[in-house]
Structures are given as structure tokens and as C-alpha cells.
Design a protein with these regions (language model features):
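Catalytic cores of nucleotide-sugar-dependent glycosyltransferases that transfer UDP/GDP/TDP-activated
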Residues: 1-361, 365-368, 373-377
């Protein structure tokens, strides 16, 4: 198949540091190419995906800017709809692309929803029912029932990029944005209750600065100690942090749609201790790859009770369950179904059926195919 992957113009593919969606796009490009497909990624000019690359902006436009994303999407769709392009599937990870897909209804478009429930974007998706929507966790899909999500495909990473760690650093780790929904203040409190140091990797985005100063900086400066902030980390120092940690703390306070850092931790053998929100219960296999706890007190108790945890078993289970090759194969199967459905519709009508892009499209699609959900093994 000839496949176009449309990413954002805000972060490189793969990302240098922050950028979970862009890491997934990079893994898709790599493994779809490995499976024999002709892949073109639309991203920033400094990106290095497998296959071909096209770009509108040489460097990432950060912070994200709506105007830049629209120009990036316009550039991508100009190339996608060129007579010589002949893409079989366009898989976009960027919302503005949907507007361009709507004026090219003959282009088979797949869109992955990477975010939690957002009323503004739900209205956008309702306007473009001709796309095939993909979710990244069952919980995410449950929270946006208005959208016909055809399939849930859980993320995956390249296990060979994650060497085993011994967890002998004597600390627990936190990785993520220093934002209220990520719970860095809860991680500090749990580690202090457990009597261990917490080493923290992550950046502070401008909207989260007041929270950081009020909840995190205040804890760092209160004299209790036991906290090391490492700043935002690229791949190598992030792995070093995870490999030496006794556990990775994931005390989120929101409906996180997935959380790639959980499987990164598991792939080096470090268990994840997380609060029961969003996809956490889908990703953590209790007692094997981590533990789901209800609050800071339970998190602290679990930190103190990690002696005897089988890191080798954790890592092997993660390698079986969370590989990006598995993720790519599931996408490949979805693309094939989308193509088959499209070809069947054209044979039935003899011409392009413009109703596929209209208000009845979602209803017609439901009649053709029942939604499928990929569940964890």
C-alpha cells in the first residue's frame, strides 16, 4: 500500500524530547515500511522517519500554533491529492487535516484520536463523518460515545530500544509534564511517605507555571529533601532514569487516553504504580507489570513493598504486549478493511458515492461494519 502519515508541525518525528504522538507516528512509519509498504510522512523538515518525508516547515513550530497547523495540513493535502500521488490510505494524526479530507472524499482517510474528551474537537469530528476514527484505549472510546470509533488500537514501541534495568538506583521515578493532571505533587508526597528519593523528569509548559510554583516548587523548597528535578529528558537520559528506578510513579488526576511512559517503564523492567484513571487499568497488568492504587497512601505503601518484584517477568510481558510491530500490523489490517469497504462501495454504485461524505455517512458506515476493539492480551 501507499500510505501517507500526517503528523503535526509542532514536534519532530521522532521527537527529540516531548512528543508522545510523534513517537507513535515514527514507530508506525518504521514498522509499516518494514512490512513492505510505501510510506510518506508529512512532518517537520528536521524529522527522520522511515520511508519518505515531506514538510512545510523546516523546524518545529513551538508552541503549537493553529495557523501553522492549517498551513501544514494544506501543504500535505495538496501533495496527497496531486494526480500523481495515488495514496491508498491517508492516516492523519492532526485535526485540521479532517477539513481537507472532507473536500477530497475519494481519499480513504483514517484519523487517530490522541486526546481525551474535548467538546470543541467532538464537534469537529461530527462534521467529518467520512473519516475512519481510531481510538487509543477503551476508556478513551467510552468517554466519546458520540463518535463512531471503528477500532481501538493500543500504542506500541520498539522493545529493542529499551535495555533491561536492574532498578538498583535506590529511587522512584516520575516522568511527565509538570501539570496538575499529571500529578507530580502526588509523586513527591508518595515518595516522601515511603522514605525514598523521587527523581523527576519533565518540563513546565507556560500555562502550568502557576501550578508548578504553587504545588511543586513549594515542595522542592520546603527543606524536606528527597526530590531531584532533572528537567525535560531526551531518550537516553530518560532510559537511564527508568532503568535505575525501583518503580515509575504515574499518579494522574485525569482521564489520560494512554500514557506511553508506562510502557517505556515496563519495557526496561520497572513496574508502574498508577492511579486508576484513564487507560491505567488497561495498561498495567496487576502484579506483573505494575500496580493500580487509589491514593498517595496506597502508592507509598506499594513503594515500600517492592522487594521480590520480578523485573524480568515484567519486561518479557511488556515485550510481548507492547511492541510497535504489533501496533503496525493492527493498523495494516484496518487499512485493508477500509480499502475493501471503499472498493465494494464503488463496485456497487459504479461511480463515486458522494453521500459517503455527507450527514448520513456515519449511519451508512455503521450498517456496513461493526466496530472492532483490540484488547490487551
Amino acid at each position: 500500500m501507499r500510505i501517507a502519515l500526517v503528523s503535526s508541525c509542532a514536534v519532530s518525528v521522532p521527537p527529540r524530547a516531548y512528543g508522545g504522538t510523534e513517537l507513535v507516528v515514527a514507530e508506525l512509519a518504521k514498522n509499516l515500511t518494514r512490512l513492505g509498504h510505501d510510506v510518506t510522512t508529512f512532518a517537520t523538515g528536521d524529522s527522520e522517519p522511515a520511508g519518505k518525508l515531506q514538510w512545510r516547515f523546516e523546524k518545529p513550530v513551538w508552541p503549537p500554533h493553529e495557523s501553522a497547523e492549517l498551513r501544514h495540513a494544506a501543504h500535505a493535502w495538496q501533495a496527497i491529492t496531486a494526480p500523481s500521488a495515488r495514496f491508498d490510505i491517508v492516516h492523519t494524526h492532526q485535526a485540521p487535516s479532517l477539513a481537507f479530507a472532507s473536500i477530497a472524499p475519494s481519499v480513504r482517510t483514517v484519523y487517530t484520536i490522541h486526546h481525551c474528551r474535548d467538546e470543541r474537537l467532538i464537534d469537529l469530528y461530527r462534521d467529518f463523518p467520512n473519516a475512519t476514527y481510531v481510538g487509543i484505549s477503551r476508556r478513551q472510546a467510552e468517554l466519546i460515545p458520540e463518535i463512531q470509533i471503528e477500532e481501538v488500537i493500543l500504542h506500541g514501541l520498539d522493545p529493542d530500544l529499551y535495555d533491561a534495568g536492574r532498578g538498583d538506583g535506590g529511587y522512584v521515578a516520575f516522568l511527565g509534564r509538570f501539570a496538575p493532571e499529571k500529578g507530580p505533587h502526588f509523586a513527591i508526597d508518595a515518595a516522601r511517605r515511603a522514605g525514598v528519593t523521587v527523581r523527576m523528569g519533565g518540563g513546565v509548559h507556560p500555562p502550568d507555571r502557576p501550578f508548578f510554583e504553587r504545588e511543586v516548587q513549594a515542595r522542592l523548597e520546603n527543606g524536606a529533601g528527597g526530590v531531584e528535578w532533572l528537567g525535560e529528558l531526551s531518550h537516553a537520559p530518560k532510559l537511564s532514569l527508568l532503568r535505575g528506578a525501583r518503580a515509575m510513579l504515574f499518579p494522574i488526576d485525569w482521564e489520560e487516553p494512554f500514557g506511553l511512559v508506562m510502557i517505556e517503564s515496563m519495557l526496561v523492567g520497572t513496574p508502574v504504580i498508577g492511579f486508576p484513571h484513564g487507560s491505567v487499568a488497561e495498561v498495567i497488568e496487576e502484579g506483573v507489570t505494575g500496580f493500580v492504587v487509589r491514593d498517595v497512601a496506597e502508592m507509598a505503601a506499594r513503594i515500600r513493598d517492592l522487594d521480590g518484584f520480578d523485573r524480568d517477568r515484567c519486561r518479557e510481558r511488556a515485550r510481548e504486549k507492547w511492541s510497535s510491530l504489533r501496533m503496525a500490523r493492527e493498523h495494516e489490517a484496518l487499512y485493508e478493511r477500509v480499502m475493501t469497504r471503499s472498493q465494494r462501495g464503488r463496485l456497487w454504485s459504479g461511480v463515486h458515492d458522494v453521500s459517503r461524505a455527507g450527514p448520513r455517512a456515519a449511519e451508512a458506515r455503521r450498517a456496513e461494519a461493526s466496530p472492532s476493539v483490540r484488547r490487551p492480551l
